[in-house]
Amino acid sequence: MDKSISLRMMFCNVICTFLVILRHSLNLRAFFISETPANWNAIVQNGSMNITSIAVPFFFLMSGFFFFKGVDATYKDTINKIKRRCKTLLVPFLVWGAINTIILQVSDSCRYGLWDGLLFTHLWYVRDLLFFVLFTPFLAFLRNKATFILYLVLIALAILWQPVDSVFPSSEGMFFFTLGCTLRQNVLLRITCHSSMVFLVMLWLIIPFVYPIGQTIVWQKVYIFSGVLLLWILSQKMPQDINRLIKTVAPYCFFIYCAHLYVLKAIKVTLASMFRNNDAISLACFFLIPIIVTVLLLGIGVFLKKHCHTTFALLTGFRNLQYLKKNESTIL
């Protein structure tokens, strides 16, 4: 695979991992129990939810692309890749599902069932990805023998796509995973950054704070799809310093993604109970807690990899070794 594509995917992987954490940092209900405010704090946090909505679609897109790596694959190659995905996805899905179940049962066993920690937490992304991988032999056949039908399937999935959909199976996940499986390396390489893109990026960032995107599904789809495209375009202009930082953080993205939710929630709920109905603290926590959680879990990940390698391998589905060898994204 072209090294520039792998490097750009790493950049997008790190950005999207942080966006997921930022999305879960929404704290209006935690700080304001009786009535959610309708002020600048709410506008910033709710508007930011639209920006973060590109993260999971990009994860699915990236996972689909890396399955075929932009080239045609034989039936045998596809089956072998499914077996490898079962190792890198099913193992951490079960391990983290067990951890989530224990946390939920200890915190509130009356509210949560035994299966909730496995099926209905932020691991829904991994759950759906495992399901979508089963359809890759069919997608491989269409890629190789019936491209026109594959395009028709994509159009149908785009129509059926419900934005920010985590219900099994996710229509959003299916569309972007199939799109990723369809993309070829030469197409991604042709999407380059021009000076005019700066204006489009600024416009894209401002829109959700002045226009209620979520009221119309069509506009929501356009906003998410254009955001995914703009993120890929911007990835071409990484400074060298950012490039080095990305290479350091990327091997731990999957661990951070799986581990962040309850760490973030504990910090958020604790601070909310101490500073109830405080807009300034609420907004500060919204932006600062994701940074704190990311740095904290990055440190824990580095420690586990160095001193508890087997544990870290189980928590990440042994994908870290694959990453070091192939320089691929670790969210797959």
Where are these regions (language model features)?
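Alpha-helical transmembrane segments and their immediate juxtamembrane cytosolic regions
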Residues: 1-332
